[in-house]
């Protein structure tokens, strides 16, 4: 069993975040003794899932719904599946967007590296895509 401070340190989260998750009902089996929250391995696993889902872009209300579905057993598999399909699609779209951003940044790095080597932008400005390295086009 772990105190809220220990869990906060383990997950590098503010204590206030753990209190908020508790208030939102994300730790339904959390034990309290003399006003102290005691986190078991079950809560630690729930927290791992919560943090993963947050990083994937799920809002707390959706995470809460997912956690409730998990307690309801196999009958909620279709809902859980749909939740993850939607989130997968959203994450894949974000990855595509970030890839385009990274491509532009790589191009600008290449562009200014060449401009610095030449002492100006004149040559690099007039290059056609066919004259650029494959990874920059």
Positions of PLM-derived features:
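Basic helix-turn-helix/winged-helix DNA-binding cores
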Residues: 1-68
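Helix-centric, low-specificity signal for extended rod-like, repetitive segments
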Residues: 12, 41, 47, 73, ...
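Amphipathic alpha-helical dimerization/coiled-coil segments
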Residues: 55-82, 86-87
């Amino acid at each position: 069993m772990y105190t809220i401070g220990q869990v906060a340190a383990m997950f590098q989260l503010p204590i206030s975040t753990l209190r908020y998750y508790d208030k939102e009902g994300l730790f339904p089996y959390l034990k309290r003794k003399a006003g102290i929250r005691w986190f078991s391995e079950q809560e630690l696993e729930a927290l791992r899932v919560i943090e993963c889902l947050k990083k994937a872009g799920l809002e707390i209300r959706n995470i809460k719904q997912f956690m409730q579905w998990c307690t309801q057993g196999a009958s909620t598999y279709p809902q859980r599946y749909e939740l993850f399909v939607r989130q997968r699609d959203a994450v894949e779209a974000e990855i595509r967007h970030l890839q385009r951003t990274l491509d532009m940044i790589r191009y600008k790095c290449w562009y200014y590296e060449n401009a610095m080597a030449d002492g100006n932008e004149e040559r690099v400005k007039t290059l056609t895509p066919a004259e650029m390295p494959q990874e920059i086009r």
